[in-house]
């Protein structure tokens, strides 16, 4: 116990030296007004790194349990504005207030089961109200287990009425280092059941705490030194190239969540493990606005009705460990839980508009194995987001893809040339076919004319053959007639010779006859006269006989 008290005083002194005395610190309640258990004062406030100390830091919230002081948690404070339906303790107007019911934006430990039940967390308390001590209370509340114990005043904090109970969780602080509060995880659901009004009355007495931190060095000096080393390493601009190469190696191994966390830390959007997401507004105000909006969304879901008292059971609850942070069973797709983009994470993404930028080309050459790609390949990669993301994890595959695209382009070009040549040949053949068809028509016309002439000649030849046959027949007829005439002429000449002979004989005989006749002429004359007379006589007789 002596060592623990010494350690607690040591931690409070360091806390005061880190943050100083602030005007918004919580006044301490006198011990006489609190029913404190000395067994629960062992855990002290965690150390905050000096680079994030600010005199204007916001303070914690009222205690969540009236009789117990569990170990304080540094992960429950989210800056938010006062809701219209919340209790208004300050008549002074719209002052900035803090709500205990709002979890951290992305992966705070309020989204995990808390160490102790806190049925009075759904309240927004103004910091100036606590400073001025305006709460005229009938009940004194001890310091909340989820507030920072950096106050130096001695006045007591009083509230006018008890806050409505809400759903509470239990969890262990020791398993997760403070640096993992930037991880966008969905908190695991604890086993829970509702209690009646009588059970809620006895719950605060019978519910034990789960786990208490006994060593102040685990959350104190160790976390502070670790976070100082992390920020000094990541904020060193000379190590950006080493970070890029290490992130590329981690992405090959599948640790993309850790890369996003480290790049967001390097950009200065996250603070050390003891600060909440709301307290980093001095580093990155835009990220703070996004975290406030997501915190308000989750607060509206986690609110319960004022009349319904819900308390967890005494059964065992799981605590999220480092190993479960990287399990793929948890949901990483909720857009409201994703952290705002930081320069560290955006440097790994390449858009087509960055293709002309020389700095992006240099970053690419460092990422892609120190200039493995040529300038033309770099332009193609930067023009395509998918290729750029793939080049981070597997540059050889991107190289193969680009080579395949080039070969495909060459083959396509050859194919197009071949198609053009074939089209030219087809056109040439078509023109030749047209000319040949024209010549063929002319030849067909000539052939038709020649066939007609041939037919005419055939007819004429046939006619001439007929004429020749007729001439031959005529010649034969003429030859026969000539022969017949010749024969006729030969017979006539013989007859003439015979006639000449006969005429000569007849002349001689006529001369002899004449001589003889001349000699016999008077005799003949007489005979003739006698014959005539005889004839006359006969004729006369005949005529007479006839008469």
UniProtKB/Swiss-Prot annotation:
| Sequence segments annotated as region (Leucine-zipper) | 422-457
Residue ranges, compositional bias (Low complexity):
279-294, 517-535
Composition-biased stretches (Polar residues): 15-52, 74-89, 134-157, 264-275, 344-356, 536-547
Tissue expression:
Expressed in roots, leaves and flowers. Expressed in the root tips, lateral root primordia, and guard cells of leaves, hypocotyls and anthers.
| GO function terms (MF aspect) | DNA-binding transcription factor activity; protein homodimerization activity; sequence-specific DNA binding; transcription cis-regulatory region binding
GO CC entries: cytoplasm; cytosol; nucleus
**Where does the record place the region Basic motif?**
396-417
Which key words are in the record? Coiled coil, Cytoplasm, DNA-binding, Growth regulation, Nucleus, Stress response, Transcription, Transcription regulation
Annotated region (Disordered) at 1-199, 244-312, 333-356, 517-547
Where do Pro residues bias regions lie?
63-73
The principal localisation class reads cytoplasm
Residues in a coiled coil are: 416-469
Compositionally biased intervals (Basic and acidic residues)? 120-132, 249-263
Q: Which CDD domains match?
A: bZIP_plant_RF2
Domain bZIP, first and last residues per copy: 394-457
Query: How the protein assembles, per its UniProt entry?
Result: Forms homodimers.
In its miscellaneous comment, the UniProt entry states: Plants lines expressing a bZIP29-SRDX dominant-negative repressor under a constitutive 35S promoter are seedling lethal.
PANTHER family on file: BZIP TRANSCRIPTION FACTOR FAMILY PROTEIN-RELATED, TRANSCRIPTION FACTOR POSF21-RELATED
Function according to Swiss-Prot or TrEMBL: Transcription factor that acts as a repressor of reproductive development, meristem size and plant growth. Regulates meristem size, cell size and cell number during plant development. Binds to the promoters of the cell cycle regulators CYCB1-2 and SMR4, and genes involved in cell wall organization, such as XTH9, EXPA1 and EXPA3. Possesses transactivation activity in yeast. Possesses transactivation activity in plant protoplasts. Plays a role in abiotic stress response by binding to the 5'-CAGCTG-3' DNA sequence found in the promoters of MYB44 and TRX8.
Identify this protein by name. Answer: bZIP transcription factor 29
Record the organism: Arabidopsis thaliana (Mouse-ear cress)
What gene does this protein come from?
BZIP29
């Amino acid at each position: 116990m002596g060592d623990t008290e010494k350690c607690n005083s040591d931690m409070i002194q360091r806390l005061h030296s880190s943050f100083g005395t602030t005007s918004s610190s919580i006044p301490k309640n006198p011990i006489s007004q609190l029913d404190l258990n000395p067994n629960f004062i062992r855990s002290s406030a965690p150390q905050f790194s000096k680079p994030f100390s600010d005199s204007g830091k916001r303070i914690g919230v009222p205690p969540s349990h009236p009789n117990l002081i569990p170990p304080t948690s540094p992960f429950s404070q989210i800056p938010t504005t006062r809701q219209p339906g919340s209790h208004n303790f300050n008549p002074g107007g719209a002052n900035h207030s803090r709500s205990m019911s709002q979890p951290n934006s992305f992966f705070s430990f309020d989204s995990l089961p808390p160490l102790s039940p806190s049925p009075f967390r759904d309240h927004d308390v103004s910091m100036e109200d606590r400073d001025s001590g305006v709460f005229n209370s009938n009940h004194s509340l001890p310091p909340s287990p989820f507030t920072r114990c950096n106050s130096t005043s001695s006045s007591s904090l009083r509230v006018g009425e008890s806050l409505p109970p809400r759903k509470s969780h239990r969890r262990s602080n020791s398993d997760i280092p403070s640096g993992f509060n930037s991880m966008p995880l969905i908190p695991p659901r604890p086993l829970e059941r509702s209690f009646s009004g009588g059970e809620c009355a006895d719950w605060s007495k019978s519910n034990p705490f789960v786990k208490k931190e006994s060593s102040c060095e685990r959350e104190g000096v160790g976390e502070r030194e670790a976070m100082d080393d992390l920020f000094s390493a990541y904020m060193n601009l000379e190590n950006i190239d080493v970070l890029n190469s290490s992130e590329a190696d981690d992405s090959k191994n599948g640790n993309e969540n850790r890369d996003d966390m480290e790049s967001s830390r390097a950009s200065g959007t996250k603070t050390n493990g003891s600060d909440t997401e709301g307290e980093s507004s001095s580093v990155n105000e835009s990220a703070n606005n996004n975290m406030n909006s997501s915190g308000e969304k989750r607060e509206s879901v986690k609110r319960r009705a004022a009349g319904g008292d819900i308390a967890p059971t005494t059964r065992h609850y799981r605590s999220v460990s480092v190993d479960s942070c990287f399990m793929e069973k948890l949901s990483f797709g909720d857009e409201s839980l994703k952290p705002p983009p930081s320069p560290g994470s955006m440097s790994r993404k390449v858009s087509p508009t960055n293709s002309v930028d020389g700095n992006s080309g240099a970053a690419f050459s460092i990422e892609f194995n120190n200039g493995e790609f040529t300038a033309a390949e770099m332009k193609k990669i930067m023009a395509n987001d998918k290729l750029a993301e793939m080049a981070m994890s597997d540059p050889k595959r991107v190289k193969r893809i680009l080579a395949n695209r080039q070969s495909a382009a060459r083959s396509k070009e050859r194919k197009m040339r071949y198609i053009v040549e074939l089209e030219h040949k087809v056109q040439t053949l078509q023109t030749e076919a047209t000319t040949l068809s024209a010549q063929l028509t002319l030849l067909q016309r000539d052939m038709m004319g020649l066939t007609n002439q041939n037919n005419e000649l055939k007819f004429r030849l046939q006619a001439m053959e007929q004429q020749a046959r007729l001439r031959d027949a005529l010649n034969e007829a003429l030859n026969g007639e000539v022969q017949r005439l010749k024969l006729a002429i030969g017979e006539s000449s013989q007859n003439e010779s015979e006639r000449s002979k006969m005429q000569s004989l007849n002349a001689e005989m006529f001369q002899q006859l004449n001589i003889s006749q001349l000699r016999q002429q008077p005799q003949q004359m007489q005979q003739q006269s006698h014959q005539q007379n005889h004839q006359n006589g006969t004729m006369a007789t005949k005529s007479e006989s006839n008469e």
